[in-house]
């Protein structure tokens, strides 16, 4: 309470006198409260430090009790430039040889050099990436950069990136897949008029174009029925003098001779040319018979008995030459080779032949109204009708079945024409980088692949990251999967350090300095002694579930020093880690293992009902009571101050009245 000095004329400072009286009453009680609060807070802080160090040990032991605590793996590689690896706890320890046959890469195609001022469109690009596709509409007179922006900006673009490379000869369009692997191939088809520069952006492999021809051929076959090549009239088989068929070359010569003889015989009974042909045929027969009867040394150059086995196995007889028809047809026959030449060139109907068959049937149908067609053609030449109008008028004269037949023939012819144009007049893009999967040879026997350069679970629990291709003349990279002994070793070291930290902290908090007599905040506290006793009881106990050579902590080289801390004999520890790593879980794990016992002991100290928590709760309650004591003291002192001030004020007033009366009396006595 702030009160101004009153009655200074009487020489009294009431406020100062009241403050001194109140302080004399407050100080001893306030000092007791402050001392108690300091002691309580110091104890709470000390218990907090103990609990923290104990909980560190408890958490370490909780890690040891996890199922896969001792299943962590480490992976090392002999060539990190070729392959790296990561391993899960499921990985089996061992060493594996890795040959990287090829890295995964994305598909990339490029156009030919384009004119600087080229304009594209109108038309449409249909771009495929694997099984996904999207369309790009190209307006008339679009620039190359417009096409690039259209591709890259398409919302449904599954991962095709377009760019322009400025070659020394001019710009090129590059299309690249963002996704690697053989299943992410780029394809581009173009819908545009013939001669449109958009055709430069088409991309089809040779296989695609051949397949298109086959599909067109199949469409023709649907219209015409099973296609068969024109058959040559069968020639009578010619036998040698022993009744055996002649070799092919002799048979062919004899056939030719007979044909010549027959042609000549049609003109005169036996002409000189016929005689010559017959003679030539007989000579071919004789020559074939003679060759078939030759011994090996007579028909195989360089033959000897010593080399007979090799030469007989390896020597190839000269192959027959194809006739002119077969030579002309062979390039159009898929899968043609010399071995199958006779069969394929005779039986296979090419797309060109299918087109001829379609035209032949079409001509046969239209022949019925050939006269009308000539008249309509004349009107088309004069400009009176368009070709399409003439076609419709012409076919209207046919019966419905024939019209339908012609429409199907037209469709088949259109497919053949398109496929042939694509095959023969291809101007599109070329492949500059093949889309391929990564391939790895594991231990020289197992071949693995992935669409990217990460092969998951290449070995159970092991993922491989491929970085480079193995060199042919160098040994394969080797990866080693091992138990993570170093991690377990570090955890054991951390546990020992955590206990030593707890022990040193507890000693500092509960000790008494013999020189000064100063005590720690927990000096004489039984909680500290109880906590240490519990832990050391576990340290010295035996774990029944563990193997015989791992029954106690001392088997790991962990013992108690004279100072009370733990120390590690690293020779013993490393020996156990190297020789008995698979058995460590039996010592630390389980509900009765070492880790669980440590956890239980610490929980009995730091848990909700543990001794430290109980003491902390008690000290906190004492702090609450001190707060109440402080509030009560403050109320009492405030009341004391008011009462004392009132007394001094009343005294001052009484003194003033007495002085007034005394003055009046003195004046009266004069």
UniProtKB/Swiss-Prot annotation:
Disulphide bonds in the chain: none
Ranges annotated as biased composition (Basic and acidic residues): 284-300
GO terms, biological process: bacterial-type flagellum-dependent cell motility; cell adhesion
Coiled coil: 342-428
Residue ranges, compositional bias (Low complexity): 272-283
Keyword annotations from UniProtKB, A to Z: Bacterial flagellum, Coiled coil, Secreted
Listed Pfam families: Flagellin_IN, FliD_C, FliD_N
Subcellular localization, as worded in the UniProt entry: Secreted; Bacterial flagellum
One Gene Ontology cellular component annotation held by this UniProt entry: bacterial-type flagellum hook
Biased composition (Acidic residues): 257-266
Quaternary context: Homopentamer.
Note in the entry: V.parahaemolyticus possesses two flagellar systems: a single polar flagellum propels the bacterium in liquid (swimming), while multiple lateral (peritrichous) flagella move the bacterium over surfaces (swarming). The polar flagellum is synthesized constitutively but lateral flagella are produced only under conditions in which the polar flagellum is not functional.
Biological role: Required for the morphogenesis and for the elongation of the flagellar filament by facilitating polymerization of the flagellin monomers at the tip of growing filament. Forms a capping structure, which prevents flagellin subunits (transported through the central channel of the flagellum) from leaking out without polymerization at the distal end. Important for swimming motility.
Family affiliation: Belongs to the FliD family.
Protein name as it appears in the record: Polar flagellar hook-associated protein 2
Organism whose genome encodes this protein: Vibrio parahaemolyticus serotype O3:K6 (strain RIMD 2210633)
Gene that this sequence comes from: fliDP
